[in-house]
Amino acid sequence: MQTTSSFKDIIENQDYKPQLHDVTRYFYNVKIDGKFVPVHGEESNCLMVFLAYVMMKTPAIIESYSGGGKSCMANAVLSLIPEEEKYSIELGSDKSVWYDREKINEKSFVYAPELQKCMQNLDVRELLKNWGEGKTAERKVAISIFGQEDSVREQTINWHPFLSTFALENKDAFIDEELRRRVVTIHTDCSRKQTREVLKNKLQRVATPHKMMTMDEKEIMKLRLHILHILGQTKEKMPSFLNPFAPILHKSIPDVFTISRSYIDYLINVINGSALFHLKERFKFEDMIVVAPQDNWFALRIYGTQFFESCLKIPMLGKEVLKMFPKKIIQGEQILDECFLEVNQVQQKMKEAGYLLESGKIRAILGLLTMSGYLEEALEGKEKKKRYCLGNLSSDWSTHLEWEREIKNVKEFIQKEYPGMYEEYDKKYCQNLTITDPINGERINLLELKNGKNEDINNKNVRGMLDEFIKC
C-alpha cells in the first residue's frame, strides 16, 4: 500500500464516506506489485478478515485446502495496510524471531504465512500463543562477559495482531488447541461452484484485461486514505465502543456449547469494526463510539454463517455433509438401515453436490460431527466397518430478528439508560434505515426485512444475513 499523498488529497478526503461494499469492490480490483490479482466469490470472508484484523486488530487464521484461496485472500487484505506497518515472519532458525525483535516491535501488524510450518518452530508457536492471549512475549537471556559476573537480560516482543493461513490436508500439520481458541478462524469456499467462478474469472481476465478494472485509481486512493486515517487514530490505543443494540442479539446466539462464550467476542469485534470503518458517520457519547443498528446487521451479514457454525462446533464443510444424510427413522429400538451412510457413500453424494474430497477428509469431518453429537456411529460386520446416521443434536438454530420491532426496543432502551444521547441516536441512526449490502451492493431497508421469513430474504437476495440460519 502506497501512502504517499499530497496535503490536498488528505484534505479532500475528509468528506469521503465509503461503504463496506467499496471494500468489496476493492477486492475485485487488487493490484500487488503492479500485478492484477483480484479476489472473487469470497466477499464475506475478505470483509470478515478486514474488519477483524485490520480494523479491530484481532488475530485471525484463514483455513482451507490447497488451492482454496488462502494466500490470495490474505495478500488482498494485507495490501490495504501500509508496508511500513507490517512484518512478515519468514521461518528460519528457532530463535530467528527473537533476533528480529526490534524490527517486529516497530510494526503494527504481523503476517505469519503457512501456520502449519510455524507450529513446528517452538519459538514462533509460543509467540503466536502469547499474542492470541493478548500478551507480550518475554524471555530471559544469560549474558556472559569474560572477567565479569554473569547476568540475565530480559527481551520482549510486544503484542501484535497477526494473520496466518493454514492448509487442512497436511497430515503432519496441527494448530495448537490453545491457539485455536484465541484467534478467529475463517474458512474459504471450496465448492465446485466457486472453483468454476475462479476459472471463469481468470480466463476472462486474459481475454478482456481492459475491462477487468472496475474501480479507478482515484477512488482506490480515497479508500486507502480513509483506512490510513483510521489506522492512525487507533495506532496507540483502540477506542471504546457503546452498542445499545447488543443485548438484543443474545436471543439469537447458540448456547449449546461453552465455546460460544469465546466466539461472541469475535462477533462483537466485527460489529465494532464496522462502526470504526464508518467512523465519519458515527458519533461519540462519553468518549465512546456509539455503534449503529446497521453495524450489527453488517456483522451478521458478513460473519453470521461462520459465527453460528463455530458456536455449534460444525467443522468446515460440516453443514454440507449433514445435508447428505436422510432423516433418521426409528422402528422399535432400531434405526432403519437406510438411514446410515458409509464413508464412500458420503463421498459420492458430496461429489454429486460439487465437492470433490478425498476419503480421508470425509472421515475427518464425520469424526468431528460425531464427537459433537450431530452424527451417530455404528460398526457393521466382522470388519467393524463404520456407518453414520444423523444424531440427536440438531444443527438447526433459529436466529431471525424482527428489525422493525427491535429498532423500537433499542430506542426505548436508550431513553431509559442513556437519555442524553437519545435524540442524536434517533436522528443519525434510526430515521433512514436504507443501507448498502456489503456483499452485493444492493440497497436494502432493514425495516422491510420482517420476521426473518425466507421469502423476504430471497426477494432481497440477502440469505447470508442469517435472519434465519439455513437448516439442513
Set out the residue ranges of the language-model regions.
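Conserved ASCE/P-loop NTPase catalytic core
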Residues: 37-213
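Charged, amphipathic alpha-helical linker segments immediately N-terminal to NTP-binding catalytic cores
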Residues: 2-43
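Terminal-proximal interaction/regulatory segments of ATP-powered molecular machines
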Residues: 314-472
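Structural motif
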Residues: 33-45, 255-264
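Phosphate-sensing "switch" segment of ASCE/P-loop ATPases
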Residues: 155-161, 171-320, 325-327, 447
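Short, hydrophobic-biased segments on the C-terminal half of alpha helices
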Residues: 78, 268, 363-367
